[in-house]
Amino acid sequence: MMIEMRLMGGEKKARESVNEYPALNEYLGIEGLPELTTAAQKLLIGPDSPAIREKRVCSFQTISGTGAVHLGGLFLARFHPQHPAVYLSSPTWANHNQVFTSAGLSLGQYPYFHPETKGLDIDGMLAGLRAAPAGSVILLHPCAHNPTGVDPTQEQWKQIAQAMRERNHFPFFDCAYQGFASGDLIRDSWAIRYFVDQGFELCIAQSFAKNFGLYGQRTGAFHFVAAPGPDAVSTTANIATQLSSLQRAEISNPPAYGAYIASRILNDPQLFAMWEDDLRTMSGRIIDMRKGLRQRLEAKGTPGKWEHITDQIGMFSFTGLTEPQVKLLKEKYHVYMVFPFSSPLAPLGS
């Protein structure tokens, strides 16, 4: 059902027009499709961002979000003078560990999920950020945290930014669900825009798998944003050269088909509006599934508190169930959950 919805409206029209492109089977450049990466910058950082206007952003099309994280990891491992460790939230997307270690980076963790409240452990997170060695790379999920579904509030993001500023940490955002979390593209990128506006030097991995339905086309982007300053433009140009050398050695040319589809939608006002409507529909359905699940659990008098199901956001929910409870669901009812007991909400029926 979810994929069928994604192929409706703007995306279906974009695919039809892209199929007629005469250059569809030609190589893209090493940096990817410029019309896509330029539009992707504006989608994440904002079309009026001083960082874009001042040419402090360089962008490369990647093999979806995983490829973007990988390219960023390689860049940090090869060219960051301090060779910092990458600190991941506890828990995080499982593949983060493999991608960064394969790039040759050491890893650390900071507290994130509070098992008792089933919400954000903001005090533990801030303490963990302040305890990390100065200049560490901090991997952050800007929206729809995977796998907990727990996001900081805007006020908490400001506290996180302050703690990172105190320790001169380097933010690395992994943005896989923009527009798919709340249905609002601007709201879902608020944390990124705030950090950029605060003058952080940072990088962003961007995936178009979920919000465009381009799973098999593997379309994404990696962005580096330089801090404002007299050398910002030359710094950005130098980093673009370094990224180009890494991209050439890894994949040479990113895939074209998904890039043309995403670019067509992002650069056509009518298709963009249709796409936004589809995002609101899909994210709204998941929000409704959360409400319905909580209502049914509470109506049946299920022991425990269940407000965390509606407080969390995105495709996954940390249920708070115990290991014996999850085992019972699996063996008796064939309900399967990802360790440690995160449940995908999209497959639920009404």
State what each model feature region is.
Residues 274-332:
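Conserved PLP-binding catalytic core of the aspartate aminotransferase-like
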